[in-house]
């Protein structure tokens, strides 16, 4: 089952050299402090991002708070799933339904963990096919789409 999470992208903290982990931990501590009023399950580092999971459905409200933490570039509301294609395809449909009005979309898959058997192009096709079935009146548009569905395969 897909869990709603916040995927935190950060600024120049990621450019630091040997002390990068130290700065990432400081940023994680600052995020935890900012989210003291929320029921946070975990704040963890994954492949150049910080993942914040919750015990309750609080990701939408928490994203607004996380955006105010110094060092945070942006916060994406996301769904965390297993590597099961049915799970991540269902999460993609759910995410696109939540997007709001749109006429065109694009799928952009990225794998930082290359031990997964599907390539990024395979994932694009697989998720795109499911989205085309779920939204038959919407167009796939590679350049300047109204909505973009990102699929990240990490750790």
Briefly describe each language-model feature range.
Residues 1-155:
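RNA-binding accessory domains that recognize and position tRNA/RNA substrates
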């Amino acid at each position: 089952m897909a869990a709603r999470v916040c995927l935190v992208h950060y600024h120049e903290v990621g450019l630091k050299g040997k002390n990068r982990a130290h700065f990432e931990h400081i940023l994680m501590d600052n995020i935890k402090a900012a989210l003291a009023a929320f029921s946070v399950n975990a704040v963890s580092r994954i492949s150049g991002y910080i993942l914040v999971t919750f015990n309750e459905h609080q990701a939408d409200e928490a994203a607004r708070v996380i955006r105010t933490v110094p060092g945070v570039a942006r916060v994406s509301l996301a769904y965390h799933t297993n590597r099961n294609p049915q799970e991540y395809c269902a999460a993609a449909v759910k995410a696109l339904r939540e997007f709001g009005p749109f006429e065109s979309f694009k799928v952009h898959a990225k794998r930082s963990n290359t031990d997964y058997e599907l390539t990024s192009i395979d994932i694009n096709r697989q998720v795109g096919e499911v989205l085309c079935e779920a939204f038959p009146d919407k167009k796939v548009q590679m350049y300047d789409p109204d909505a973009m569905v990102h699929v990240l395969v990490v750790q």
